[in-house]
C-alpha cells in the first residue's frame, strides 16, 4: 500500500525559481508598506483638518509637510514595485526561452541522427536506382510491343474472341435432349362430333 500511494517525486527547484520567489516576497512587502503609509496619511490629513479648526495652524502645517514627504516615499515605493515585477517577468520569460532552446536542441540532435542514417548521397542513390528501374521496365514494354508482327496481333485478337465466345456459351441454358410427345391433331374434331351427336340421341329418346 505504501508503494501505491507514495509521495510524488519532488520537482527540482532551480536558482531562477528561488530568485523569482525572493522578488515576489520583496514586492509583497513593499505593497504592505505602501498600504500602511496610505492609511497613515489619511489619518494625518484628517488630523490636520481638525488642528486648523482648533486654530493650531503650525501643527497642521507640520503634518501636511510630513504628508508631502510620505507622498514622495509612496512614489518611490511604486517605482520599486514596478521594477520588481518587471524583473520577475524577465526571469520567467527567460525560463521559457531556455525551455524552447532545449527543445530545439533535442530536435536538432534527432535530425542529425536521422541524417546520419539517411544521408543525401543515400537518397540520391535510391532515386537513381528507382529511375533506372522505371526506365528498364519501359524498355521491356517497348520491346514486347514492337516484337509482335501483324500475324501475331491477329492471332492474339482471335484468341481473345474465342475466349469471349466460350464464356458467352457457358452462360446460355442447355437445351433438353428428350423429345416432347406429339399432340394428336384430330382430337378437337372428334370432340365436336360427340357434342353434335349427343342432342340427336336425346331427341330420339323423346
From Swiss-Prot:
Pfam families: Snf7 (PF03357). GO terms for cellular component: ESCRT III complex; late endosome membrane; multivesicular body. Its main location: membrane. Keywords: Coiled coil, Endosome, Lipoprotein, Membrane, Myristate, Protein transport, Transport. InterPro entries: Snf7_fam. One of its GO terms (biological process) is protein transport. Residues 167-206 are annotated as: Disordered. Probable core component of the endosomal sorting required for transport complex III (ESCRT-III). ESCRT-III components are thought to multimerize to form a flat lattice on the perimeter membrane of the endosome. Residues 187-206 have a biased composition (Basic and acidic residues). Residues 168-185 have a biased composition (Acidic residues). Probable core component of the endosomal sorting required for transport complex III (ESCRT-III) which is involved in multivesicular bodies (MVBs) formation and sorting of endosomal cargo proteins into MVBs. MVBs contain intraluminal vesicles (ILVs) that are generated by invagination and scission from the limiting membrane of the endosome and mostly are delivered to lysosomes enabling degradation of membrane proteins, such as stimulated growth factor receptors, lysosomal enzymes and lipids. Residues 11-103 form a coiled coil. A lipid is attached at residue 2 (N-myristoyl glycine). A motif (Type-2 MIT-interacting motif) lies at residues 170-181. It comes from Danio rerio (Zebrafish). It is a lipid-anchor. It comes from the Eukaryota. Belongs to the SNF7 family. It is found in: Endomembrane system; Late endosome membrane. The gene is chmp6. This is Charged multivesicular body protein 6.
Amino acid at each position: 500500500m505504501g508503494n501505491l500511494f507514495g509521495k510524488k517525486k519532488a520537482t527540482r527547484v532551480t536558482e531562477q525559481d528561488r530568485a523569482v520567489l525572493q522578488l515576489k516576497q520583496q514586492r509583497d512587502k513593499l505593497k504592505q508598506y505602501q498600504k500602511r503609509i496610505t492609511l497613515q496619511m489619511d489619518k494625518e490629513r484628517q488630523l490636520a483638518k481638525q488642528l486648523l479648526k482648533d486654530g493650531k495652524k503650525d501643527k497642521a502645517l507640520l503634518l501636511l509637510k510630513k504628508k508631502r514627504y510620505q507622498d514622495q516615499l509612496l512614489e518611490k515605493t511604486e517605482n520599486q514595485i514596478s521594477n520588481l515585477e518587471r524583473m520577475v517577468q524577465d526571469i520567467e520569460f527567460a525560463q521559457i526561452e531556455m525551455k524552447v532552446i532545449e527543445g530545439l536542441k533535442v530536435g536538432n540532435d534527432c535530425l542529425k541522427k536521422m541524417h546520419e542514417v539517411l544521408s543525401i548521397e543515400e537518397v540520391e542513390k535510391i532515386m537513381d536506382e528507382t529511375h533506372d528501374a522505371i526506365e528498364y521496365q519501359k524498355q521491356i514494354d517497348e520491346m514486347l510491343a514492337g516484337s509482335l508482327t501483324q500475324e501475331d496481333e491477329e492471332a492474339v485478337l482471335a484468341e481473345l474472341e474465342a475466349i469471349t465466345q466460350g464464356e458467352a456459351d457457358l452462360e446460355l441454358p442447355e437445351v433438353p435432349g428428350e423429345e416432347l410427345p406429339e399432340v394428336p391433331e384430330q382430337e378437337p374434331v372428334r370432340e365436336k362430333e360427340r357434342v353434335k351427336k349427343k342432342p340427336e340421341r336425346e331427341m330420339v329418346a323423346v
